[in-house]
């Protein structure tokens, strides 16, 4: 969208709602987000209305490879550096980066969010979720307060939400609810993050499974968490 102060930088989104209008606004928004970091990076956004949900690993890999075969003509370490977003996690980034190397025969900083074994950054997975909570905690300090002892609700159950829950818990809060696009769970005893990770990261399931596995937890279908 804008590269006035550096190469384009922003996430790739794979979700059925993706269209040109959404990506244009997200790219516009990314310009300001990146500018506020003080780093020499511009803003951009990309993606597809491909939905990884319900697809096999082979199907996701095939799409990522086809997508990168075209995208690789327009990106590079000093031109445009995509990252992950909704629907594009470590698995998808790995497939995309593998195809980039295969087509361009280059091993450079062309995608962020890669695994540690092929050039990724330590704690990249946790960074966004942790950042949300650190900023919230700093805001509360301005009001002579902190997260310690607070009851917290977190929207989502993907990568950002999982690590926001983890950091909030480490800072003394009790997270009692999370959600996905189908509904939300409530656990008055505090969310068991190991169970959530197993459901979302290992089995790639839906958050409603949490209520079947944790005593005292409930699931509400078709209602927003707020």
Language model: regions and residue ranges:
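Glycine-rich beta-alpha junction loops
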Residues: 1-3, 43-48, 87-88, 158, ...
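Residue-level signal for pocket-adjacent positions within structured domains
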Residues: 3, 7-9, 31-36, 43, ...
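A general structural signal for short secondary-structure junctions and capping/turn motifs
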Residues: 4, 40, 72-73, 166-168
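Glycine/serine-rich phosphate-binding loop and adjoining beta1-alpha1 elements at the start
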Residues: 15, 32-148
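Residues that form generic nucleotide/phosphate-binding pockets
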Residues: 26, 70, 95-99, 198-202, ...
């Amino acid at each position: 969208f804008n590269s006035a102060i550096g190469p384009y930088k922003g996430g790739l989104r794979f979700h059925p709602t993706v269209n040109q209008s959404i990506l244009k606004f997200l790219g516009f928004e990314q310009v300001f987000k990146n500018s506020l970091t003080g780093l020499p990076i511009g803003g951009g956004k990309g993606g597809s209305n491909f939905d990884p949900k319900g697809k096999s690993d082979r199907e996701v890999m095939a799409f990522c490879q086809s997508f990168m075969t075209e995208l690789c003509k327009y990106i590079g370490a000093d031109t445009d550096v995509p990252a992950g977003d909704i629907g594009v996690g470590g698995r998808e980034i790995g497939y995309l980066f593998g195809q980039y190397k295969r087509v361009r025969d280059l091993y450079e900083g062309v995608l962020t969010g890669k695994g540690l074994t092929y050039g990724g950054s330590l704690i990249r997975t946790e960074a966004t979720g942790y950042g949300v909570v650190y900023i919230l905690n700093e805001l509360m300090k301005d009001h002579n307060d902190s997260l310690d002892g607070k009851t917290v609700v977190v929207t989502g159950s993907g990568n950002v939400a999982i690590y926001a829950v983890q950091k909030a818990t480490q800072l003394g809060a009790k997270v009692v609810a999370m959600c996905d696009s189908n509904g939300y769970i409530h656990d008055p005893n505090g969310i068991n993050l190991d169970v959530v990770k197993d459901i979302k990261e290992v089995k790639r399931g839906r958050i409603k499974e949490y209520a079947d596995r944790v005593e005292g937890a409930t699931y509400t279908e078709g209602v927003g968490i707020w």
